[in-house]
């Protein structure tokens, strides 16, 4: 069984409802009653609250009259009460088009509020206290969000609700407030000028002429008593601003000139080191007895070595080890040269050099091999080296022509010397050493540690001098006859002052004893002639 339902006809279709009506809220019963502002009847406190709420509602909202008209006209069935609510609702939902419009409307609202408060204060003279108008109202702008607060702070403070006071007191304060408004301070600047400190000069200290100026030296950045003229005229030696001149005759009196005889500044005597005061310490700093520093430059000796065909006559490469085919060929050629040289030299001299006791007399040592690190070369040594070189060349020519072999007995007698000579080459130049050993590294065994030395040098000359001193089988000793008291003969004073190298002795004579020129050269040559050898 089917049932048939008859629905009433719709008054309006969905197309008649506008978009604005969907966002309208139903009318509130509190806003149904409205009272005119000009009524003269006395009302209770409740009626006053309702009256204030109904009149203040449009003042708390933002205005946009264009949108309000559209929303009202689209609904023909709205009542008068709904009309007012819709007008207020449109103001809430619509945002002002510009900030200037909002700012102007806010100023206008504040002005109306101030007038309304004044009217309400005089409309009810029978009331003991005036009701707080802003009791239930919330300002949409707080102190931090209101853009007008920073330039109208004083005006807003005057408009804020004051605590409840009797009307008699308000009548007394009214002329005072009017007088204060007449004498308002100007609005503060957006960027106020900052106070800056005044620069006080030294002449400004003191204030008055009667008061004596007092300078606190702890707070002054400079001494006001010093001027360029003061420094020029004041030549006191005690002043820290005066630098003694190089010439002792300028600006110095006769009594002050001897103080600068040795270029010593008075008051700084302890900063100078005198050689006579500390003998042993200065000798340790200057001399190279330990053989740790081998980078002293001796240009004269280097020039001599390069201009006289290498290191002939110097026991330089007794333990020099080289690798490669080039070094093997050189060693084979040198073995032949060494064997022929041994024929020319007597066997007794070789036995003296290598089989000698701890100390050997100077006469028993042949002077054919001068010191490798002498700073000065004697003329006699140069002639001996040249003779030895010429003898080697003649022997090489004879040996190449004859081609005879040496006897076994001669080889056995010279076994100790030839084995050591195989490790080095007397005729190798600095260029050949650099070619075979670019880093100038010493591959010999360190006698003190028993491990390879592996020291590297910047020049072949430094490598040769290192091997002649550190890795030499016989250590050279040069004596200073001045320190030992044997300068003019005699037994001496019992002291020993020895050096392992000739350049260290020459520096000692020049620095310690102050000898230069021919006197120093004579002592150095005498020490070379009397050089001593001690087995390591």
Swiss-Prot record:
Keyword Lipid biosynthesis set for record: no
Asked whether the UniProt record includes Transcription among its keywords, one would answer yes
Please name the PROSITE patterns in this protein's record. ZINC_FINGER_C2H2_2 (PS50157)
Bias class Low complexity marks the residues at 154-181, 361-370
- Which region ranges are annotated with the description Disordered? 154-196, 353-375, 393-434
Protein induction: Expression is induced by HAP43, by osmotic stress, by oxidative stress, by heavy metal stress, and during biofilm formation.
> Which InterPro entries does this entry report, sorted A to Z?
Znf_C2H2_type
* UniProt record, GO biological process: proteasome-mediated ubiquitin-dependent protein catabolic process; regulation of transcription by RNA polymerase II
- Sequence ranges of Basic and acidic residues compositional bias: 393-411
Keywords for this protein: Activator, DNA-binding, Metal-binding, Nucleus, Stress response, Transcription, Transcription regulation, Zinc, Zinc-finger
Q: Where are the zinc fingers (C2H2-type)?
A: 440-471
What broad class describes the main subcellular location of this protein?
A: nucleus
Quote the cellular component terms of the Gene Ontology held in the record.
nucleus
According to its UniProt record, where is this protein located? Answer: Nucleus
Q: Which is one GO molecular function term here?
A: zinc ion binding
What this chain does, per the entry, is described as: Transcriptional activator of a number of genes encoding proteasomal subunits. Binds to the DNA sequence 5'-GAAGGCAAAA-3', enriched in regions upstream of proteasome genes.
**Mind telling me what this protein is named?**
Transcriptional regulator RPN4
| Gene giving rise to this polypeptide | RPN4
């Amino acid at each position: 069984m089917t049932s048939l339902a008859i629905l009433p006809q719709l008054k309006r279709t969905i197309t008649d409802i506008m978009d604005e009506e969907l966002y309208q809220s139903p009318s509130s019963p509190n806003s149904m009653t409205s009272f005119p502002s000009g009524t003269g009847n006395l009302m209770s406190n409740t009626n006053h609250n309702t009256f204030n709420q109904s009149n203040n509602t449009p003042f708390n909202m933002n205005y946009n009259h264009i949108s309000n008209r559209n929303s009202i006209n689209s609904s023909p069935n709205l009542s008068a009460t709904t009309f007012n609510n819709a007008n207020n609702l449109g103001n809430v939902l619509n945002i002002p088009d510009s900030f200037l419009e909002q700012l102007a409307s806010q100023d206008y609202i504040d002005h109306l509020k101030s007038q309304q408060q004044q009217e309400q204060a005089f409309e009810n003279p029978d009331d003991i206290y005036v009701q707080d108008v802003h009791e239930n109202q919330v300002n949409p702008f707080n102190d931090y969000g209101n853009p007008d607060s920073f330039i109208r702070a004083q005006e807003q403070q005057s408009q804020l609700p004051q605590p409840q006071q009797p009307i008699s007191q308000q009548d007394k304060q009214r002329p005072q407030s009017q007088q204060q408004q007449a004498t308002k301070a100007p609005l503060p600047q957006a960027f106020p000028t900052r106070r800056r400190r005044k620069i006080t000069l030294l002449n400004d200290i003191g204030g008055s002429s009667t008061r004596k100026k007092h300078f606190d030296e702890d707070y002054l950045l400079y001494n006001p008593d010093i001027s360029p003229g003061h420094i020029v005229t004041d030549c006191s030696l005690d002043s820290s601003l005066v630098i003694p001149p190089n010439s002792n005759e300028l600006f110095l009196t006769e009594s002050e000139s001897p103080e600068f005889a040795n270029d010593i500044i008075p008051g700084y005597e302890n900063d100078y080191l005198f050689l006579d005061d500390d003998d042993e310490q200065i000798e340790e700093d200057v001399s190279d007895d330990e053989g740790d520093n081998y980078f002293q430059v001796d240009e004269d000796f280097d020039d001599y070595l390069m201009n006289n065909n290498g290191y002939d006559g110097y026991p330089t490469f007794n333990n020099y080890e080289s690798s490669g085919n080039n070094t093997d060929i050189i060693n084979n050629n040198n073995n032949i040269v060494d064997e022929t040289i041994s024929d020319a030299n007597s066997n007794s001299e070789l036995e003296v050099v290598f089989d000698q006791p701890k100390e050997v007399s100077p006469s028993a040592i042949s002077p054919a091999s001068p010191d490798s690190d002498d700073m000065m070369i004697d003329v006699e040594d140069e002639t001996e080296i040249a003779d030895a070189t010429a003898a080697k060349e003649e022997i090489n020519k004879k040996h190449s022509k004859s081609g005879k072999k040496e006897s076994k007995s001669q080889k056995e007698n010279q076994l100790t010397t030839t084995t050591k000579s195989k490790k080095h080459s007397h005729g190798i130049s600095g260029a050949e050493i650099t070619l075979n050993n670019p880093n100038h590294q010493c591959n010999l065994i360190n006698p003190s540690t028993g491990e390879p030395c592996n020291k590297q040098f910047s020049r072949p000359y430094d490598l040769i001098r290192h091997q002649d001193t550190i890795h030499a089988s016989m250590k050279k000793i040069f004596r200073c006859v001045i320190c030992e008291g044997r300068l003019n003969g005699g037994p001496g004073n019992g002291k020993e002052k020895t050096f392992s190298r000739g350049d260290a002795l020459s520096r000692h004579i020049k620095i310690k004893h102050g000898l230069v020129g021919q006197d120093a050269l004579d002592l150095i040559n005498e020490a070379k002639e009397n050089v001593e050898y001690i087995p390591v």
